[in-house]
Amino acid sequence: MLYSLLRPLVFALEPETAHGIAFNAMETAHRLGLYRARPAPCRSRSIMGLTFPNPVGLAAGLDKNGEHIDALAALGFGFIEIGTVTPRPQPGNPKPRLFRLPQANSIINRMGFNNNGIEGLVANVKAMDYKGILGINIGKNFDTPVEKAVDDYLICLRKAYRYASYITVNISSPNTPNLRQLQQATELDSLLGTLKLNQQRLADEHGKYTPLLVKIAPDLELPEIDSIAALLMKHRVDGVIATNTTLSRAGVETLPHAREAGGLSGAPLAKRATSVVARLHHALQGALPIIGVGGIMDAAGATEKIAAGASLIQVYSGLVYRGPHLVGEIAQVLCNANGGGLDGASST
């Protein structure tokens, strides 16, 4: 109720300014103990060797540097993913680079992996009180040639490994030049081979196995999805996140800002993202879990992702448009389904 009253004021501000103000307010409320969500009664679920208290996660992109983990955790998330982080700090693309399309409950962004670098993120993670499941989403610096991208991923993998519950390899942002080339079969085969080899070395070194996931785009043809699924299984990748933002403007073509460059998230992405989840589920046959994300604006949207084959879901734009209560709303519905558990894909 409070968020619905405040939203018009927040939306009157430039989006990145509003983002900063919202986080400052959330941090203040958290420090004063003014809010703490009551998690929905839920049977915890073991996926990738991790115990998830509920299936609702925060997607990467909202807290790029891991500066607000404790405050976000108080909203009742079952897991939190921070990043995307790169080896070196970078400012991202010039502003303006974030645009709301409120008529369609959607957002266009061309942020360009603005972040303070992996060392800054790790310092924030080490300072947090949060003891829940934390994903760290890693990417390459904008000026790293795509043929050298593996070097950037390795730097981030090695520095984040000890502190992450799982690590997501972002090869699908549309806002870093040529990044999506890494979804092509030859490039992805090589990248996954190198990352999995180093994952095992790090597991031996630290006595801790940190699952490795890959985040893919929604703008893939069916044969491309099948090819990616085959490579994920070949390299025994631990999970897949579907999907990132889309370059499509279907359904929003006439709206203000629709022609802005960048990736579209929010309600118009829902059907496309769900279809990718369903195709992955068919191709993977339960071999690894899917985290469904893209256009989830309510519990019904989350249920659709689970029905399509996702084991867990993540929200971002829905949180912006619906407010913090969305987390508990979705968790309550999903946790009440099937006696507090979920069906979805493999939970191994």
From Swiss-Prot:
MF terms (GO), sorted A to Z: dihydroorotate dehydrogenase (quinone) activity
One Pfam family per UniProt: DHO_dh
UniProt-listed GO biological process terms: 'de novo' pyrimidine nucleobase biosynthetic process; 'de novo' UMP biosynthetic process
UniProt-listed Enzyme Commission number(s): 1.3.5.2
Reactions listed under catalytic activity: (S)-dihydroorotate + a quinone = orotate + a quinol
Keywords assigned by UniProt, alphabetized: Cell membrane, Flavoprotein, FMN, Membrane, Oxidoreductase, Pyrimidine biosynthesis
Broad enzyme group: oxidoreductase
Quaternary state and interactors: Monomer.
PANTHER family linked to this entry: DIHYDROOROTATE DEHYDROGENASE (QUINONE), MITOCHONDRIAL, DIHYDROOROTATE DEHYDROGENASE (QUINONE), MITOCHONDRIAL-RELATED
Family annotation (HAMAP family): DHO_dh_type2
Protein name: Dihydroorotate dehydrogenase (quinone)
Provenance organism: Nitrosospira multiformis (strain ATCC 25196 / NCIMB 11849 / C 71)
Gene that produces this protein: pyrD
